Regions:
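Sec-dependent signal peptide recognition
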Residues: 2-9
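Noncatalytic, helix-rich "gating/capping" subdomain that lines the substrate-entry/channel surface
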Residues: 86-383, 387
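Intrinsically disordered, low-complexity linker/terminal regions across diverse proteins
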Residues: 5, 73, 228, 263-266, ...
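Active-site-surrounding "flap" and adjacent substrate/cofactor-binding loops of secreted or lumenal enzymes
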Residues: 40-43, 48-113
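C-terminal motif of bacterial Sec signal peptides marking the signal peptidase cleavage site
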Residues: 15-18
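Bacterial Sec signal peptide processing site at the extreme N-terminus
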Residues: 20-29
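Short secondary-structure subsegments characteristic of cysteine-rich extracellular domains
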Residues: 62-84, 219-238, 507-513, 606, ...
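Hydrophobic/aromatic-rich, well-ordered segments within soluble, folded domains that form packed cores
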Residues: 34-55, 189, 193-212, 576, ...
Length: 680
C-alpha cells in the first residue's frame, strides 16, 4: 500500500461532507439505551454515557471483563466459526489451506480423542524433547534439548526473536531478551502484598496438581514446584519491570556475535543457534543483559535435574490447553479463575476457533475479508485517516512549546506514516505447514513452522514493511515505531467503532479517536524517540524535549492519583504512553471532526449536538464490566488504563468536552484549566 497523500483541508472537507450526505440521512450512531441519565455528565461521564449498557450486560461466568471490544469479538467469533465450519464441511484437497483449517479445527473439537489418547502424544513429545523419568541426563540435554523445545513453542530461560534493528530500522536483527517466567513478569515473584501472595499460592497448587495428574507422585510434584519457583524467582529478580521495559534506549544493547560469546560464555551460543536453525549470526541485541547473566548463573549453579524440571513444567504448562479436559480445567482454574476471576471456561468451539486463528490467522483472514469487509468501508476509513493526519499536522504547527526546527521534523515524521487499512497486500504462504489429526502435534507443528518462517523471512534480511503484525479479523489497531506505520485491521472497522450508516459525529468520536490514538503513539514518550525512518534517534532539541517531559509529568501524576480499587492506585508510569495516545487521539480527532463539518454542520439529533455525540461515541467504546481480580491483574501488567478511566481520566483535560456539556467547577470531574494536560 502506498502512502496516502494529504489533500487540502477544503478538499478533505468536501470528501467528508459527500460521505455523510445523500438520499438517506445518516444516523447518529448513539444508542440512547446505553446511557444512565441518573448521572450528570460532569459527575461521571463514563456512567452517564455507558451506565445503561453496563446494567444490560452483566458479567457472565465466562468473562472477567466484558465491554465493547468483547461484543465485537463475540460477533467475529461467530463469523469465524461460520467460515471454519463451512470449510470443514467440504471435501478439501490434501495439503490445501482449506484442509489445514478444517483438520486443525476438527482436532481441537475431538474431545473423545483428546481425552482417551492424549497421553501417548504427550509422552512422545516429552521423551522426544529429552525428558527422561530415570533422570539419566547429561550436559548435552542443556545444549540440544533446550532450543528444540523452544522451536516447538515451549518457553526457555530467555527469549529470542528477529525484528527490526531499532537503530538501523531497514534491517532485521536477532534480539535476545529476558524470559523464563510462567507468571509473565517479575512483580508476581517479588511483591509481598496479600493479593500477590494469593497468586503465588494458586500457582503452587496448579503446578503440583498438573504434575500429579500427569502421573508424578505428590513428593515428585512438590520437588518440581520447588525447583520451578526457585529458578523462576532468580530470573525474576534479575529481570526488568514492565515500566522499565518501556524505555527503548535502556533496552537497546547491540553487540557482535563474537562479543556475545565473550561477554556471556556460560551459554553455548553456537549450539543454541544451530539447533534453532540459525547459522551465521553476525550481531544481536541484548535487551536486558543482567537477566541473561542470571541465566548463565542458573545454568552453572543449579543441578541439571532441577533445570530439567523447569523445562518439564514449561512443556506441561504449554501443552495443558491442548490435551485432555482435566489438564485444561487445571490450567483454567489458575489462569482464568485465580488470576482473572473468571468462573467458567470458554466453550470448546471458541477455543478451537482461537487456535485456528492463532495458527492460520492470515489464511482465515483472507476468507474473512472476502465475506465480511466491503470495499467502501476501506475507502471511507482511508479518508478518515487522511483527515486525521491533516489535523495532527495542524496541532503540531500551533504548539507554542515546540521550536520551529522540532516542528519541522515532527511534521516530516507525520507525513511519512505508512498507513495500512483492512488487510495486507500479500498473504502468508502456509504450503510447508503440515496439519494432521492430533491437536497437540498440530500446535507443536504450528509453533515450529512460525519460528522457521521467522528465520526464513527475517534472518540476515531486510525488514519487509508490508508485513502485518495483526490479522485482518483482529479487533484492535497498532502503531509500529520501527516502520513508522499505523494499522487498522478490518476486524475493528465495525460498530461500535466504525459505522457506515452513522454520521461523522459518531465515527470521529469512535474510530476517529482510535486513528488519532495510533498516530499519537508516534509522538508519545516512547514513539517520539524514533525518527521518520523508524530509527531510535534523538531528533528533538534539548529544550523542546525538556518542555515535553514537563508536560507528560503532569499526565503521569494525574493518573498515579487515580484509585481504581480501595487502596489500589493506577500506575501512571506504566500507562503513560497509552494515556498520551488517548489524550492526543481525542484532541486530534475532534479537530478533524470540526474540519470535516465546517462547510456542512451536522444537526442536533435526539437532543444532542454533534459535539456531544462525538464524546458519547468515544465513551461508548470503553463501556465495560470488570471483576476486581481482573482489575488487579491489569494494574500490575497492562499498559492501558481501565475503561472507566480512559473516559473519566481523559475528558477532564479536553476543553471541548467542557464546552459541549457545560461542565463547571461545581462538577466532580472539573479540573482547573491551569492543571489540565496539554501536549498535542
Amino acid at each position: 500500500m502506498k502512502l496516502l497523500k494529504l489533500m487540502s483541508i477544503m478538499t478533505l472537507s468536501a470528501a467528508a461532507a459527500a460521505c455523510t450526505s445523500g438520499n438517506k440521512p445518516l444516523a447518529s450512531g448513539i444508542d440512547l439505551a446505553n446511557m444512565d441519565t441518573t448521572y450528570q455528565p460532569g459527575e461521571s461521564f463514563y456512567m452517564y454515557a455507558t451506565g445503561g449498557w453496563q446494567k444490560a450486560n452483566p458479567l457472565t461466568a465466562e468473562y472477567s471483563r466484558y465491554g465493547s471490544f468483547d461484543v465485537l469479538q463475540e460477533n467475529n467469533n461467530k463469523q469465524l466459526r461460520e467460515l471454519i465450519e463451512g470449510v470443514s464441511a467440504q471435501e478439501n484437497a490434501p495439503g490445501s489451506v482449506a484442509q489445514k483449517i478444517a483438520s486443525l479445527y476438527r482436532s481441537a473439537m475431538d474431545s473423545v480423542n483428546l481425552n482417551e489418547h492424549y497421553w501417548g502424544t504427550l509422552e512422545e513429545f516429552l521423551l522426544c524433547d529429552g525428558y527422561q523419568s530415570s533422570r539419566d541426563v547429561t550436559e548435552n540435554w542443556l545444549r540440544d534439548v533446550w532450543p528444540r523445545m523452544q522451536r516447538q513453542g515451549v518457553p526457555g530461560l530467555f527469549g529470542m526473536y528477529i525484528c527490526a534493528d531499532e537503530k538501523d530500522s531497514k534491517n532485521n536483527l536477532v534480539s535476545i531478551y529476558q524470559g523464563g517466567l510462567t507468571l509473565g513478569q517479575k512483580d508476581y515473584y517479588v511483591d509481598d502484598d496479600p493479593e500477590t501472595q494469593r497468586i503465588r499460592e494458586a500457582y503452587k497448587t496448579y503446578v503440583v496438581a498438573l504434575c500429579q495428574h500427569q502421573g508424578f507422585s505428590e513428593k515428585d510434584a512438590r520437588r518440581i514446584w520447588a525447583d520451578v519457583i526457585r529458578i523462576e524467582t532468580r530470573l525474576a529478580r534479575a529481570s526488568k519491570s514492565m515500566t522499565e521495559l518501556r524505555d527503548p534506549e535502556a533496552n537497546y544493547n547491540k553487540i557482535s556475535y563474537k562479543e556475545l560469546k565473550q561477554q556471556f560464555p556460560g551459554i553455548d551460543w553456537d549450539a543454541y543457534f544451530q539447533n534453532i536453525g540459525m547459522e551465521g549470526v553476525r550481531e544481536v541485541c541484548l535487551g536486558q543483559p543482567a537477566a541473561i547473566h542470571e541465566v548463565e548463573a542458573v545454568l552453572k549453579e543449579e543441578p541439571v535435574e532441577a533445570l530439567q524440571n523447569v523445562y518439564l513444567w514449561h512443556a506441561l504448562n504449554m501443552a495443558s490447553s491442548y490435551i485432555d479436559d482435566e489438564s485444561r480445567a487445571l490450567n483454567f482454574a489458575f489462569y482464568g479463575t485465580a488470576m482473572s476471576g473468571k468462573q467458567e471456561d470458554r466453550p470448546r468451539w471458541k477455543r478451537a476457533v482461537s487456535s485456528v486463528e492463532g495458527a492460520l490467522g492470515e489464511a482465515l483472514g483472507q476468507l474473512y475479508v472476502e465475506r465480511f469487509f466491503p470495499p467502501e468501508a476501506k475507502e471511507r476509513m482511508e479518508r478518515l485517516v487522511a483527515n486525521l493526519q491533516v489535523a495532527l499536522g495542524e496541532r503540531i504547527a500551533v504548539q507554542e512549546w515546540m521550536s520551529d526546527e522540532t516542528k519541522k521534523v515532527a511534521q516530516d515524521k507525520l507525513d511519512a506514516f505508512y498507513v495500512k487499512v483492512g488487510y495486507p497486500n500479500k498473504w502468508k504462504d502456509y504450503s510447508t505447514l503440515e496439519i494432521g489429526d492430533s491437536y497437540l502435534r498440530n500446535i507443536l507443528a504450528c509453533n515450529e513452522w512460525e519460528l522457521q518462517e521467522m528465520v526464513r523471512t527475517k534472518f540476515n534480511k531486510p525488514v519487509d514493511r508490508d508485513e502485518w503484525y495483526m490479522t485482518p479479523q483482529t479487533v484492535n489497531a497498532y502503531y509500529n515505531p520501527t516502520t513508522n506505520e499505523i494499522c487498522f485491521p478490518a476486524g475493528i472497522l465495525q460498530p461500535p467503532f466504525f459505522d457506515m450508516e452513522a454520521d461523522d459525529a459518531f465515527n470521529y468520536g469512535a474510530i476517529g479517536v482510535v486513528i488519532g490514538h495510533e498516530m499519537t503513539h508516534g509522538f508519545d514518550d516512547q514513539g517520539s524517540q524514533y525518527d521518520k525512518e523508524g530509527n531510535l534517534r534523538r531528533w528533538w532539541s534539548d529544550e523542546d524535549r525538556q518542555r515535553f517531559e514537563e508536560r507528560i509529568q503532569v499526565m503521569r501524576a494525574f493518573h498515579d492519583s487515580i484509585e481504581v480499587l480501595p487502596g489500589l492506585h493506577a500506575n501512571g508510569s506504566l500507562t503513560l504512553g497509552e494515556n498520551m495516545a488517548d489524550h492526543g487521539g481525542l484532541m486530534v480527532s475532534f479537530q478533524a471532526f470540526q474540519n470535516a463539518t465546517k462547510q456542512a454542520p451536522l444537526p442536533v439529533i435526539d437532543g444532542f449536538t454533534p459535539e456531544q455525540r462525538f464524546f458519547l461515541a468515544y465513551a461508548n467504546v470503553w463501556g465495560q464490566n470488570i471483576r476486581d481480580e481482573e482489575i488487579r491483574k491489569r494494574v500490575k501488567s497492562d499498559p492501558h488504563e481501565l475503561g472507566k478511566w480512559r473516559v473519566d481520566g481523559q475528558l477532564p483535560h479536553i476543553d471541548a468536552w467542557y464546552d459541549a456539556f457545560g461542565i463547571t467547577e461545581q462538577d466532580p470531574m472539573f479540573v482547573p484549566k491551569a492543571e489540565r494536560v496539554t501536549i498535542w
